[in-house]
């Protein structure tokens, strides 16, 4: 089921995460690292630990989801790890859609969010990215597409989800003919013979369901990073 598949992806992601030496920053001395790095005094430390931070999100498998009243997913695991290691508490607030989340961010109703959607706000600070940003190029098995590199997408019709870091990366760097869609359902319905480009973890999650008629043609890293964004009012925590 969905839970089993999500657990597999999280496990796989953390294996890649460990292989790339990111654990050092997120080890058992995480809070002490921040305290020392930012010269935070005992009073500020107590304030950091006493507050419950509002984490805003839109359900986005496999990164952020609510399953049996638990916040789960790849991004969620980072936040839950902070709770386990430091005792910092979060209130997870789910929004119906991206517009609602953006409105809450503009009103500073959330203290932290995962910037999968490439949201710009001067009121928030970017954390250091610890994510592996990889994309997957998919084509229908019946169409016999050939993609051997990022450059080989030049002139090809490519479908992407709008309002994502991946879309911004392709818009800025690719010479493909890009068609953007607001949601996965519409993208799959109207892509026809287009190639589809999605986050690699999204592909892994849906490979046997939504993408069962597609084959993986090519994958690579993108230079646009995923970040957690933290309210500037809590810059000491950042």
Name every feature range the model reports, one short phrase each:
Residues 38-47:
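Intrinsically disordered, low-complexity repeat and linker tracts
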Residues 1, 76, 80, 84-85, ...:
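Acidic, polar ligand-binding/catalytic clefts
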Residues 136-140, 153-213, 217-221:
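Membrane-proximal low-complexity regions enriched in glycine and acidic/polar residues
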Residues 17-21, 108, 191-193:
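Short glycine-centered helix-capping/turn motifs at secondary-structure transition points
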Residues 19, 23, 91, 178-179, ...:
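Secondary-structure boundary/capping residues
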Residues 10, 46-124, 157-160, 168-190:
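Extracytoplasmic small-molecule ligand-binding "clamshell" domains
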Residues 1-39, 73-85, 141-167, 171-172, ...:
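Extended ligand-binding regions for polar small-molecule ligands
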Residues 48-50, 71, 130-132, 153, ...:
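A generic fold-level signal
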